Amino acid sequence: MKFNALVLSAVAQVASAHYFFDTNIVGGVAQPAFKYVRESSRATKYNPIKFSSNPAADIRDGSTADGPDIVCNQGAFKSAGKTQVMTVNAGEEIRLKLAVGAKFQHPGPALVYMSKAPTGSVKAYDGSGDWFKIFQEGVCGNGDFTSDAWCTYNRDWVAAKIPKDTP
């Protein structure tokens, strides 16, 4: 199956809206930053997208978690033409690596979703179609629920296997 890794990583960005991914790793090989991930046009790359009851007061750059930018990040569709498409086999694991040397430092789950480009090239797909969950992880231990009880805590990646029945 061919897909852009960003389509896979989009909801991982929702679950950890302070973070963004720039690299994917398949078969143990890390790819260059933004080779297979659409780059956002945000002036400050590491800038949280927020839910807001008062958007005029606390949104730094106009992106909200219930708007179109949450799918691939602000302005990311503009870089779709230069973003390469990686072929990943059904059943294979893909690891999404956080950018700017970040590690997850907030408690919470990791959720990974996929969306199929309806027709044509995935480069022309803006992510506005249907999504389905392929992976989730939450609490892994008896640690502190405000930190290290969560599987993702202090990691710089999220990994998921592409479902074997993916066309």
Feature map (PLM): residue ranges:
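Fungal secretory targeting signals
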Residues: 1-22
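Structured recognition/catalytic domains enriched at protein termini
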Residues: 16-167
